[in-house]
Amino acid sequence: MKMLLLLCLGLTLVCVHAEEASSTGRNFNVEKINGEWHTIILASDKREKIEDNGNFRLFLEQIHVLENSLVLKFHTVRDEECSELSMVADKTEKAGEYSVTYDGFNTFTIPKTDYDNFLMAHLINEKDGETFQLMGLYGREPDLSSDIKERFAQLCEKHGILRENIIDLSNANRCLQARE
């Protein structure tokens, strides 16, 4: 009986783990990230980039998947006014990597997603010979569980981003009223 319970537990853990994907992995299905998203947390090794009025304090509204690119629709807040910003990210030659020009040259991957609830993105920006990295946690709903937020914080730490540079935006003005 104990063996049967252990087998069931093991199979359950395998099934739960199998539902997560990475854009650099073989099991990644880009079509499944299509649709509405909300910015939950931003993190960066240059915190000023994601603070109020920072150029990378962007609130994701939608990802539209095309054949070799992604159309990303964001909102940004400047002087308490919401503005819409759209950009096209093109596939690069590296598996699961996309590039976009915005305040420099950016490449990004999606290290983790379960498609239905959350998406974690890792971006590297290069501008004027300097680089910084940014990570974002996005949800299908306006907020996510503390467990997912903690997993994101641990992923940030693995990329060298300190916890004090992680900003939870779930209670910030994310221009939710500007969504169509």
Curated annotation (Swiss-Prot):
CDD domains: lipocalin_MUP-like. Abundant in the urine of adult male mice but absent from that of females. The lineage of its organism: Eukaryota, Metazoa, Chordata, Craniata, Vertebrata. The gene is Mup1. GO terms for biological process: aerobic respiration; cellular response to food; cellular response to lipid; cellular response to starvation; cellular response to testosterone stimulus; energy reserve metabolic process; glucose homeostasis; heat generation. Disulfide bonds join C82-C175. GO terms for cellular component: cytosol; extracellular space; nucleus. One of its GO terms (molecular function) is pheromone activity. This is Major urinary protein 1. Binds pheromones that are released from drying urine of males. These pheromones affect the sexual behavior of females.
